[in-house]
């Protein structure tokens, strides 16, 4: 079970859609939603420097294209995995299903890719069933369509 999630997405409306989906799936958790990759980078840098893994979320969902940010979701995932030692389940949540982007995300260290839509609940439910394998690092990369 996921206790804490960080959602990095520039669309405030999707923050609400995601939160509603989590509620409908009876996911009791701490959900923090932020709008920029820069803000997420600063949080991970803080957690890394302080060595405080208690504040770090268990799972991070990152939008592919984050407007107003210095870098996109794939670059953020690469940075988290390589600069901060990861320690979280992390993947992309995007309306794109471009195979080249999906492959880039996988190479950057993304563990999953969820196709974003207003009807996100079935994909999140399927992801939640797979989550223990992601947490144990035994799940293969998967695209949830």
Model regions and ranges:
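Short amphipathic alpha-helix used as the core "switch/output" element in two-component signaling
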Residues: 71-86
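Alpha4 helix (beta4-alpha4-beta5 surface) of REC/receiver domains from two-component response regulators
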Residues: 71-75, 96-114, 118, 122
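Active-site residues of response regulator receiver
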Residues: 62-65
């Amino acid at each position: 079970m996921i206790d804490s999630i960080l959602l990095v997405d520039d669309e405030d409306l999707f923050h609400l859609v995601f939160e509603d989906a989590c509620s409908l799936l009876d996911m009791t958790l701490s959900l923090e939603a932020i709008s920029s990759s820069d803000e997420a980078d600063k949080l991970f840098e803080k957690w890394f420097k302080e060595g405080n893994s208690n504040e770090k979320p268990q799972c991070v969902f990152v939008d592919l294209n984050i407007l107003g940010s210095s870098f996109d979701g794939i670059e953020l995932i690469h940075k988290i995995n390589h600069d901060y030692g990861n320690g979280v389940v992390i993947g992309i949540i995007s309306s794109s299903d471009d195979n080249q982007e999906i492959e880039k995300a996988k190479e950057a260290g993304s563990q999953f890719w969820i196709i974003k839509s207003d009807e996100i609940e079935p994909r999140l439910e399927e992801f939640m069933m797979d989550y223990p394998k992601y947490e144990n690092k035994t799940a293969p990369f998967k695209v949830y369509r």
